[in-house]
Regions:
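Secondary-structure boundary elements
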Residues: 137-140, 170-177, 213-219
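Hydrophobic/aromatic-lined pockets within catalytic cores
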Residues: 28, 55-60, 184-187, 214, ...
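Non-catalytic protein-protein interaction segments used by genome-maintenance enzymes to assemble
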Residues: 150-203
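Metal-dependent nuclease catalytic cores that hydrolyze phosphodiester bonds in DNA/RNA
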Residues: 1-164, 276-277
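Short histidine-centered catalytic/ligand-binding loop motif
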Residues: 39-40, 107-108, 191-200, 239
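Short acidic (Asp/Glu) and glycine-rich catalytic loops that position anionic groups and cofactors
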Residues: 30-32, 184-188, 228-232
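Metal-dependent nuclease catalytic regions and adjoining charged, substrate-binding loops involved
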Residues: 97, 195-203, 208-280
């Protein structure tokens, strides 16, 4: 297993020969064909990336993200012309925005002041969460690894190599003990997170990470944090039944991907139920 402490996002995601958790989840939800499809970053993905980076590496956040703060220019416009109903449509505002955009470097991503404030509130909510605090207290660790990248050296019996990049690891003697995964959401209640859990196949994510890092699945914790007021946070893990089912399904998906790697074809890359009759 190769371990990288400072591998960039771009370099990590370029290693497409190694199967990732995202790939596994996409196969489970649809097919290998869908898992291979490239998607442009959405505003939600950009916000999630900014949030994770802020939580884990402030220096990287400052390098990669720049905040568009129009508070002062809006206040100035309204002070001079209080009759203006939409300051962003004025010449002064457009000039200010154009000058700002010219100052942004090619490798930087712009987020709004509102998004920046939301991330700060989310961070405080997570830090203050006593459930999360208890994890740090209950599990003996001597280090914390944020966004370390792990890549296997040799293919397994399915002929596959794997990669994982956990948000946060609690580590003891260089060995991962606990996996913590930040989840931005609109609703951190049990009902809402349970729906997200199955919709986005977080169970398979935990199985994949824990299997590769040899961490017990009941030591994988999701910290769900609302990205809107009141910015509640809650901590979740997996019960024994969910753990076992996720591990079994993970092995079936690995087998499916392995067969496709060995024999790429529409039959091996398409829907699992494409060439049979399915009774509902």
């Amino acid at each position: 297993m190769k371990i990288y402490s400072d591998l960039s996002n771009a370099d990590y995601h370029s290693m497409s020969d190694h199967v990732s958790s995202s790939f596994v989840k996409a196969v489970a939800k649809h097919s290998i064909q869908r898992a291979m499809k490239k998607f442009d970053p959405t505003p939600a993905l950009i916000f999630g990336d900014a949030m994770h980076t802020y939580f884990e590496d402030r220096l990287a956040f400052v390098r990669r993200f720049v905040v568009f703060d129009d508070t002062e220019i809006v206040a100035k416009i309204l002070e001079q012309r209080p009759e203006i109903s939409v300051p962003s449509m004025t010449r002064e505002y457009k000039t200010f925005k154009a000058e700002f955009e010219q100052s942004v470097k090619d490798d930087q991503t712009v987020i709004t002041q509102y998004e920046m404030q939301s991330i700060e509130y989310m961070y405080k909510s997570a830090v203050d969460n006593t459930g999360l605090q208890s994890i740090y207290q209950d599990f003996d660790h001597d280090d914390i690894w944020d966004e370390y990248s792990f890549l296997t050296n040799e293919p397994d019996f399915h002929g596959l190599n794997y990669r994982v990049r956990p948000d946060r690891l609690l580590v003891k003697d260089e060995q991962p003990v606990v996996i913590i995964d930040w989840k931005s959401c609109r609703d951190a209640s049990e009902r809402a997170f349970r729906a997200d859990f199955w919709k986005f196949r977080y169970d398979l994510q935990a199985a994949f990470y824990c299997n590769l890092l040899e961490v017990p699945m009941d030591q994988f914790f999701y910290v769900a944090i609302e990205k809107e007021f009141p910015y509640n946070s809650a901590v979740f893990s997996l019960n024994e039944d969910t753990q076992m089912k996720a591990m079994r399904e993970l092995e079936l998906i690995k087998e499916r991907i392995g067969k496709w790697k060995e024999n790429p074809s529409p039959e091996t890359s398409g829907l699992a139920n494409a060439n049979t009759i399915t009774y509902l």
